[in-house]
A protein has these predicted regions:
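Metabolite-binding pocket within alpha/beta catalytic cores that recognizes anionic/polar moieties
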Residues: 1-104
Length: 104
């Protein structure tokens, strides 16, 4: 299996990445059970990427049921050391307004 340069974990609002070419869905077993979904692998340009929909391929897993450890181990098994996790969330801080982009 080709080493993945960067992996994306999609949250609410991001269920697929049409920018990925040469798409292959791969089922990966982990020591923590099944990840949220098969993992989409392919390329964006010349970069090897993976995409994992956090809530499942059909958005059928609630936040309390997500197997986070399995998700991370599955991506690690693909050889990635770089993960970008995207989420649509709220905040109690008044200095963050809807539409702000926040890095943690």
């Amino acid at each position: 299996m080709t080493k993945i340069d960067i992996a994306f974990i999609g949250g609410s609002g991001l269920y697929k990445m049409p920018q990925i070419s040469n798409v292959k869905w791969t089922k990966i077993k982990t020591n923590f059970g099944q990840p949220s979904s098969e993992i989409c692998t392919g390329e964006i340009g010349k970069t090897k990427v993976a995409f994992l929909p956090r809530h499942g391929k059909y958005h059928n897993i609630s936040p309390t049921k997500i197997n986070y450890r399995a998700n991370i181990e599955a991506l690690k098994k693909l050889g990635t050391e770089n993960i970008i996790s995207l989420s649509a969330v709220g905040s109690l801080r008044s200095d963050y307004i809807p539409g702000d982009f926040v890095l943690i």
